[in-house]
Structures are given as C-alpha cells and as structure tokens.
Amino acid sequence: MTQQPLRGVTSLHFNQDQSCFCCAMETGVRIYNVEPLMEKGHLDHEQVGSVGLVEMLHRSNLLALVGGGSSPKFSEISVLIWDDAREGKDSKDKLVLEFTFTKPVLAVRMRHDKIVIVLRNRIYVYSFPDSPRKLFEFDTRDNPKGLCDLCPSLEKQLLVFPGHKCGSLQLVDLASTKPGTSSAPFTINAHQSDVACVSLNQPGTVVASASQKGTLIRLFDTQSKEKLVELRRGTDPATLYCINFSHDSSFLCASSDKGTVHIFALKDTRLNRRSALARVGKVGPMIGQYVDSQWSLASFTVPAESACICAFGRNTSKNVNSVIAICVDGTFHKYVFTPDGNCNREAFDVYLDICDDEDF
C-alpha cells in the first residue's frame, strides 16, 4: 500500500504471515516486529537513498527494494535484493540480485521459492532466491496500483491479479503451469467495476476482492471459483487500502479511506450484522441485494486522512481476537474484539518514534 508521504513514509507492507511489517521511507527503510512492537532494524538514507517499495521474505535477511521518493539511490524500474547477512562494509556488497525492466515496478511479492514483480500491464515470475530465472510473464489489464497476491503456503503456489475483463480476477497455479507456456489462467468475474483490492488467505483456498466502488467485499473459492459470501463495508463509495484474513481464516479485516477498519466473521457468518430490513420480510428487487449483505461484526476508527494496512494479531484467548492497524502517519493501533462485536483499543503507539541503533 502506497500513499503520498506523511512523516516520510512512502509505503507499508506486512511480511507473509503478518508478524512483521516493513516501512519504505524518504529516509530509507525500517523493519518492525508486530507483537511486541519493536524495530528489528533499518537501512539509512546513505545506504539505500529514499525508497518507494520494500518487501521482506518471511523473517529472513532478504529484502526487495525499489527506489522512489525524492532522493532515490536506486531506479524505480529495478528491484534490488538486499541480503543483510552478507559480509562487507560497502552497501554494494549486500546487493546480491537485480531485476531491471523498461517501466516502473509497482509491486513485489515473494515466497520461499519465487519472486513476483508487477508492472502496470505485465507480471513477471522468477525462481528465487538461488540462480533466478524467468518462469512466467502475464499480460494484464491496466493495473496502476500493481494489484497482486501470492500464496505463501508450501502446498499451494497460487497467484492472483486483475483479469483482462473489467472487474475480473485471474488465478494461476504456478505449480501446475509449465514455465515458458502461456496456459490460460482461471478467471473469476468478481465485480462490475475495476478491482481495487485483492487478498488470498494463508492456504490459498479463498480469495477476497473489492472493486473501485468499495462498498462490497466478495469472497470466492479458488478451486471451484464459486462465490462464498458477500460482505458489506458500507453504503458510501470508498477506496479500500487493505484486506487480510486471520491466520485460520475465521475472520477478515479491511481498511479504507473512510478511516474505519471493519472486522467480519467468516467461519460463523451468523456473527455478522444484517440489515434491519432483513427481519421485515419480503422486499423489492432493488434493495434485495442490499438486505442480503452481511455487515461487519465490529469496527474501529483510525485517522481518516492517513492510509493504513490491517491484519490480525496473535489470539490471546479463545474468545478474544485482535486486529492491528498500521498507518502512514506513523501510528500503530491494536484493538481486541469478541464474537459478540465488542471492540476495544488495547494499544496505541507511534512506531516512527521507536528507534533502535542497530542496523538491519
């Protein structure tokens, strides 16, 4: 997720299991542990310049960097792999790989054996990190946000990105597609307007997406392509920044430019709120879809002017779950919620003020 810099933050991303997040900044890179919140390390401006995108591979020493911001050291058309475990006094010694393209890189996703690089109209997949070679490339619909998700599971190598048709998603099983071939990916017609946000659950069995309208989140089975459930964020259009599943796929959270983080139940959808009209009985076709939608079981607010990413924290007990929201204004919010919809703030911090003198 990227936004105009506030306090110098150019983009924020969780790692694959949401136990860490990385922060690309005008002043370099910072890596944080989520629970407990603490800085794991940083790369300063002298080492990497201003950075537009940073992704980390699980909790390892490998980072993918893309230049950006006002004083970049690296190009916006290149992805550089930084290996902090490499010995060397010069920062060049730690740059172990480089992937260069003809157009700006908009997103990077990594798993233990592959790296996915997203341009505005094309997606490249390489073997990674040992002796990388190009495995696939896919042409896409115009994708200015660089939307894409990659399943981290050992069992499933699923890639999802916007399809050629407006509002559609393309799913590619990288394990069963032969490198160098352009086998047709499976397509899901998810929305009527362009896709604005997409996310896979941890095992890659469910995909969630929202359109530019941002009022509904739809979930589909990645195997059967059937729609599983439709969740209503609200009635006013909104830009969704982030959608994430809980680790066991029991819940889903979503953040938007309305400054609200919504939490939905997936395992037991009876916990979600319904429209009051649903209890009235028969309604006209115009509002039937509105009535059938499920509304969030809980929600909380963050500063509306500040984009944020959200994810689920570690469960503290069977009936208490937590959601973390991390904003580009430098704030960290942790809320706990119960199945009956109670939601209370448990922690607030300013992660940009947490400093560790250690380099990454």
Curated annotation (Swiss-Prot):
Main localisation: other
UniProt GO cellular component terms: phagophore assembly site
Keywords, comma-separated and alphabetical: Autophagy, Cytoplasm, Lipid-binding, Repeat, WD repeat
GO terms, molecular function: phosphatidylinositol phosphate binding; phosphatidylinositol-3-phosphate binding; protein kinase binding
GO biological process, one term: autophagy
Motif L/FRRG motif: where in chain: 231-234
Subcellular location: Preautophagosomal structure; Cytoplasm
Chain's role: Component of the autophagy machinery that controls the major intracellular degradation process by which cytoplasmic materials are packaged into autophagosomes and delivered to lysosomes for degradation. Binds phosphatidylinositol 3-phosphate (PtdIns3P). Activated by the STK11/AMPK signaling pathway upon starvation, WDR45 is involved in autophagosome assembly downstream of WIPI2, regulating the size of forming autophagosomes.
Family indicated by similarity: Belongs to the WD repeat PROPPIN family.
Subunit structure, interactors included: Interacts with WIPI1. Interacts with WIPI2. Interacts with ATG2A and ATG2B. Interacts with ULK1. May interact with the PRKAA1, PRKAA2, PRKAB1 and PRKAG1 subunits of the AMPK kinase. May interact with NUDC.
Protein name from the UniProt record: WD repeat domain phosphoinositide-interacting protein 4
Organism the protein comes from: Mus musculus (Mouse)
Lineage, highest ranks first: Eukaryota, Metazoa, Chordata, Craniata, Vertebrata
